[in-house]
Amino acid sequence: MRCPFCQHDDSRVLDSRVCEDGTAIRRRRQCPMCERRFTTIERMQMTVHKRNGIEEPFSRDKVIRGVRNACKGRPVTDADLALLGQRVEDGLRARGVAEIPSEEIGLAILGPLRELDSIAYLRFASVYLNYNTIEDFATEIDRLRDESSDKTKSSSRKRLSKQDEPLF
C-alpha cells in the first residue's frame, strides 16, 4: 500500500481488525520511509452489471433511495430503510459473488420490503416486475392476502396451544 504522506510504495501492517459488522477489515499501517502511521479499510467490492451493459460499484444508499420512493406516505422510518438496505447487502454478499446483475438486486429487495410494508412492496413490485394490467395487481394482492391469513392462522394456533398449557 502506498504511503499517503511520502508516496513510498510499501507499508507495514501493524494491526488488523474486523469492522462494520464483519464486512470490512481495518488495518493500521506504518510507512518504513517516513515512519508515519495511517489506517486503511478494506472490503469486498461488489460490482453491479446493469441492463445497458454499464458496470458500477454496488451502493446500499442507492438501494435505500429506490425503496424510499415506494415508501412515501407510509409509516416507514429511516432506521427501517437502513435495516432493509443492510439486509439486502448482506444477502447479496452471502452469495459470495463479486459481480451481480441489477435484476438480482431488485429481487433481493422484494422479500425484505414485503415484510416491512405491503403497500410499499406493491408499489416497488409494480415497477420492478413490470405490472401491465389490473389483473397483475389483483394477483399480487391475493398472494399478499393469502400470506397474511396464513400468518394470522399460525399465530392464532400458537396462542390457542399456549392457552391449553397448564398455568403451573
Swiss-Prot record:
It comes from Cutibacterium acnes (strain DSM 16379 / KPA171202) (Propionibacterium acnes). The keyword Cell membrane does not apply. Residues 46-136 form the ATP-cone domain. It holds the Pfam family ATP-cone. HAMAP family: NrdR. A zinc finger (unnamed) spans 3-34. GO terms for biological process: negative regulation of DNA-templated transcription. Residues 145-168 are annotated as: Disordered. This is Transcriptional repressor NrdR. Binds 1 zinc ion. Belongs to the NrdR family. InterPro entries: ATP-cone_dom (IPR005144), NrdR-like_N (IPR055173), RNR_NrdR-like (IPR003796). Its cofactor is Zn(2+). GO terms for molecular function: ATP binding; DNA binding; zinc ion binding. Negatively regulates transcription of bacterial ribonucleotide reductase nrd genes and operons by binding to NrdR-boxes. Keywords: ATP-binding, DNA-binding, Metal-binding, Nucleotide-binding, Repressor, Transcription, Transcription regulation, Zinc, Zinc-finger. The gene is nrdR. PANTHER family: TRANSCRIPTIONAL REPRESSOR NRDR.
